[in-house]
Amino acid sequence: MNVWLNMLTTTGLGAIIGGYTNHLAIKMLFRPHRPIYIGKFRVPFTPGLIPKRRDELAVQLGKMVVDHLLTAEGIGKKLTDENFQREMIQWAQIEVDKLLMNERSLRDVLEKWELAHVEEKAVQEIEEMLMKKVDTFVSKYYTYTWEQALPQFVHEKVEEMIPKAATFILTRGTQFFESDEGKARLQKMIDDFFASRGTLLNIVGMFLGNVSVVDRVQPEVIKFLQQEGTKQLLRDVLQKEWQKFKGREVKELASFIEKEMIVKYIVSTTKTRDIVSGFLNQSVQKICEPVRTNIVETLVPNIVQKGLTWGVNNTAHILKRFRLAEVVQQEVSTFSTERLEELVLSITKNELKMITYLGALLGGTIGLMQGILLLFLM
């Protein structure tokens, strides 16, 4: 009976000692959090291992994350995964489509993105671009004649427009002199003419009787403007002036016309400000509707694909510039010892319990073997 009691006692003591020893060793990893002193003598094994080596732990965790967890190869493999690429493309298409279907005006959207005064900036950019174009043109063709400087299609267009311009001028002239305003202007011109000729008006009045001079002159002026010969005369005049202009040098125009005047004339003539304002007041949906399908179905997948490919090729460089190891090290260094202990225990709680149980099992086994050995010795 005493033999079995001895064996049970040694086994129990061994299990208790083994389990408690491992439990104490685990606790000593974290506790105490600070060194303990008796007088000037520091108690051995204080502070615990992890509090004592926290800075080294932070460095090693940073290296572990970079060398074994977030590696360039691992990230590159993820970026080239077909399922991941498909998900990214679908997500990008949904988000871009939301932007393109926005019913707010482009002006409101840009102002929301803190791009205020976008209209003024757009007009200013256009003016600056035109100024650069004018500068480039004048610098390049300063000693050229306009015939040499202007492209061939401009020559052809002007030649084509001369007959149309002559017809337009004569048509407008005819319409003007047929109107009451034109008749009144013609009357004034006649009155001014005869006023400087003294009695000439009385002599003409004798020949015309009760018919006023303007009533006789107006039909003749209109008839003159409508004659084919007049049209040909005006075409010839315009053609001669065009030929003279082509023979002049570009520098002649640049010497008496400021470039700013040219730019402002172009902006004013083309109503650039009104065009920009009208464009900005349109909804994003209306502006993007003609190209929405092409953007969502073609452009977005291509951009995402190229972006992922670029990411694969530059992952190592990005991680190096990001200095991920330093980020992890700095974050871990800011953890309190209590939080660090809680973090480690939350991850390894079950494993540490098993280590405690294993210590108890080994201690109990050793105690049992001691009991058996004592039995044989007795």
Swiss-Prot record:
InterPro entries on file: DUF445, UCP032178
Main location: membrane
Transmembrane feature ranges: 358-378
UniProt keywords, alphabetically: Cell membrane, Membrane, Transmembrane, Transmembrane helix
Any one Gene Ontology cellular component term annotated for this protein: plasma membrane
Family matches, as Pfam families: DUF445 (PF04286)
Native source species: Bacillus cytotoxicus (strain DSM 22905 / CIP 110041 / 391-98 / NVH 391-98)
Domain of life: Bacteria
UniProt topology in membrane: Single-pass membrane protein
Family membership noted in the UniProt record: Belongs to the UPF0754 family.
Stated name of the protein: UPF0754 membrane protein Bcer98_0694
Localization, UniProt: Cell membrane
